[in-house]
């Protein structure tokens, strides 16, 4: 045998990356032979899982397409049909005794080859798509294991790497055949009937040995690449959905982040359509073929393709309802619904709009085709949405949190963190970001609120105290605020911008904990006497507390500490009204002025509205996050919001655009806060009231 042949016979193909490796580079401790590179990349603790996933993917994509079904048992005559190169490789391997194989393993190797009853016509790289899967899955059918394939959700690179580390306990003898001499399918373990998660060992048993007898339907596609939206098992779909959901959440985050400024810059027809549709969200949708599959549309946006000026409507759908799984297209959610309904993972849907129905009014049973509401002419903004077709927004009490809340809440936290720690990007987690300033929308749109983004409302509704005063919620959300107006009488406090506050306060979580402790110990004379309105610790306000503003002991007697807004849009907003008479009552991030130089400190005077100078109820008022002296009662805040127009950015009620700490970007109310403030004229008991 020539040196080249010997070298070739000594090489073993890695089950995951499908690359020929020398014996010393292979590991047989797993159900399949894998190279050290794959194991190192994936980690020995999860290699089995990756192998199972690869096995499932290969099987589900019928990588045996065009090959003969393989023997039904270990003794089937398939082995007689093996390619001569395979037989030669086996002989060479047996003599070389590669990979510390003993006699038993060598015997099993022959058995393993028998189970690969593949046609001899196909060579290793004859599969157009199987030549090199991004995931390292060579498109080889694998024993039927339903282990959740994490690979499905990973990028091609990660998948390929995962292949490197997916070497389940494989019988060494079987994989010792040089990969370049074996048909591609021979390099992979045969499909088996083992239950999901059961380790598959090549040639271990009759079930495995007959592995390649998988029906062509299960492994005949020959497409080594698994479609991004297709999974062979529920677990795979879940895994894939997680990755897709993460990507969709990123799209949603980007969409909401620059929504106002971007919408204002779009053509009027596009802007009007978006505002109209947004005002109708959220609304329920269902799959036309299975009415039990429900989702909900909660946001809209317009996207233009590169190089084109035309805009196309983009909608964000949550499916199933309340799951926080986001789809950024109708076709994507329709495809998922189709898979859930028909269990057909290979078919794609051309257009989701003709497979989805929406309910015009919740509970009416009036379901209409989504394609009728959003025909192509509307989706490309050639025509306006028919007013008679618009659904009425409905927020299911059973799942009040919209996915957009995942973006808005973190936004406040990020802003606070960014301001408190100069350099912080505010991206404390996916979706957490700092709100960008955006031009004010046309006043004509002022009457329309983006109710679709009711995430803010939902967040408020989750607040323990039922943040009635949306103003406080605004502050709590850390929405950017406008420049501070002149101090009102009774507000001798300094107007030093929060920027001046040192950024060396505690971390967001530490600040939150400190505030919690402070609030628990605060002794505001008004506590428990807020006129029946419980303290407004909304979850948003709590989030605000995460801001890095240092929290001081709530103990300044007779004084209400203004939340020192160390961070732009920090949580200090007066969702928690600064207790006028004592320690920060519910003050989110109220900082003891003594602890923070330059942080505004309220004088012992009563809290008064900056606009009307009326005395403020100590726990319910709107606090500008940037200027401590800017405090507003709800009526004045409502008037300001209405005057500015709730559809666009609504800045500080003072009429100024108070910049966030450490930046020139003004803060603005979030839509949920606006909705809360405008929800109703709640009579709030004033301190002076009997």
From Swiss-Prot:
GO terms (molecular function) for this protein are: transcription corepressor activity; zinc ion binding
Domain of life here?
Eukaryota
Q: Tell me which UniProt keywords the record has, alphabetically.
A: Coiled coil, Metal-binding, Nucleus, Zinc, Zinc-finger
Record carries keyword Protein transport: no
| Subcellular location as annotated | Nucleus
Any GO BP: regulation of transcription by RNA polymerase II
Start and end residues of each RING-type zinc finger?
609-656
Name the residue ranges with Basic and acidic residues bias. 234-245, 254-263
What name is this protein filed under? Interferon regulatory factor 2-binding protein-like B
- Native source organism of the sequence: Xenopus laevis (African clawed frog)
């Amino acid at each position: 045998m020539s040196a080249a042949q010997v070298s070739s016979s000594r090489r073993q193909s890695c089950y995951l990356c499908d690359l020929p490796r020398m014996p010393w580079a292979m590991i047989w401790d797993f159900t399949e032979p894998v190279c050290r590179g794959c194991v190192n990349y994936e980690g020995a603790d999860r290699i089995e899982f990756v192998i199972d996933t690869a096995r499932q993917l290969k099987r589900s994509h019928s990588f045996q397409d065009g090959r003969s079904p393989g023997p039904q048992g270990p003794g089937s005559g398939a082995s007689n049909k093996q390619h001569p190169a395979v037989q030669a490789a086996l002989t060479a391997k047996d003599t070389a005794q590669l990979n510390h194989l003993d006699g038993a393993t060598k015997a099993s190797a022959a058995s393993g080859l028998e189970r690969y009853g593949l046609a001899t016509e196909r060579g290793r790289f004859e599969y157009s798509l199987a030549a090199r899967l991004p995931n390292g899955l060579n498109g080889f059918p694998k024993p039927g294991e339903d282990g959740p394939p994490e690979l499905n959700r990973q990028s091609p690179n990660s998948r390929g790497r995962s292949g490197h580390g997916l070497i389940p306990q494989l019988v060494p003898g079987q994989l010792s055949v040089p990969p370049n001499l074996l048909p591609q399918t021979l390099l992979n373990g045969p499909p088996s009937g083992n239950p999901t998660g059961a380790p598959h060992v090549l040639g271990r048993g009759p079930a495995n040995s007959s592995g390649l007898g998988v029906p062509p339907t299960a492994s005949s596609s020959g497409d080594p690449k698994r479609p991004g939206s297709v999974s062979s098992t529920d677990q795979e779909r879940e895994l894939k959905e997680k990755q897709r959901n993460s990507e969709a959440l990123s799209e949603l985050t980007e969409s909401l982040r620059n929504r106002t400024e971007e919408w204002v810059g779009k053509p009027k027809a596009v802007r009007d359509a978006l505002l109209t549709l947004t005002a109708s969200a959220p609304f329920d949708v269902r799959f036309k073929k299975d009415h039990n599959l429900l989702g909900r549309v909660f946001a809209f946006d317009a996207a233009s393709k590169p190089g084109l000026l035309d805009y196309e409507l983009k909608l964000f759908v949550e499916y199933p309802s309340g799951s926080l799984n986001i789809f950024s297209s109708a076709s994507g959610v329709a495809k998922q619904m189709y898979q859930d309904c028909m269990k057909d993972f290979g078919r794609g849907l051309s257009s989701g709009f003709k497979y989805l129905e929406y309910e015009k009014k919740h509970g009416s049973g009036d379901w209409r085709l989504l394609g009728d509401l959003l025909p192509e002419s509307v989706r490309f903004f050639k025509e306006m949405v028919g007013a008679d077709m618009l659904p009425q927004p409905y927020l299911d009490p059973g799942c009040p949190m919209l996915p957009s809340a995942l973006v808005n809440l973190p936004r406040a936290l990020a802003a606070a963190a960014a301001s408190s720690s100069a350099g912080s990007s505010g991206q404390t987690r996916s979706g957490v970001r700092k709100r960008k300033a955006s031009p004010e929308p046309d006043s004509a749109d002022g009457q329309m609120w983006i109710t679709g983004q009711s995430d803010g409302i939902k967040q408020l509704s989750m607040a323990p105290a039922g943040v009635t005063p949306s103003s406080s919620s605004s502050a709590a959300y850390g929405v950017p605020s406008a420049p501070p107006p002149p101090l009102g009488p009774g507000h001798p406090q300094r107007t030093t911008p929060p920027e001046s506050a040192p950024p060396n306060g505690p971390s967001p979580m530490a600040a939150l904990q400190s505030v919690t402790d402070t609030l628990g110990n605060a002794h505001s004379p008004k506590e428990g006497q807020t006129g029946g309105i419980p303290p407004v610790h909304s979850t948003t306000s709590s989030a605000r507390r995460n801001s890095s503003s240092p929290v001081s002991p709530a103990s300044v007697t007779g004084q209400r500490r203004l939340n020192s807004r160390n961070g732009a849009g920090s949580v200090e907003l007066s969702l928690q009204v600064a207790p006028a008479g004592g320690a920060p009552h519910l003050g989110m991030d109220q900082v003891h002025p003594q602890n923070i130089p330059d942080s505004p400190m309220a004088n012992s005077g009563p809290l008064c509205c900056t606009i009307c100078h009326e005395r403020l109820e100590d726990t319910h008022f709107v606090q500008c996050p940037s200027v401590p002296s800017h405090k507003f009662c709800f009526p004045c805040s409502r008037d300001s919001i209405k005057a500015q127009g709730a559809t666009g950015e609504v800045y500080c009620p003072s009429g100024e655009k108070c910049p966030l700490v450490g930046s020139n970007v003004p803060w603005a109310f979030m839509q949920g806060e606006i909705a809360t403030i405008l929800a109703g004229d709640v009579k709030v008991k004033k301190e002076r009231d009997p």
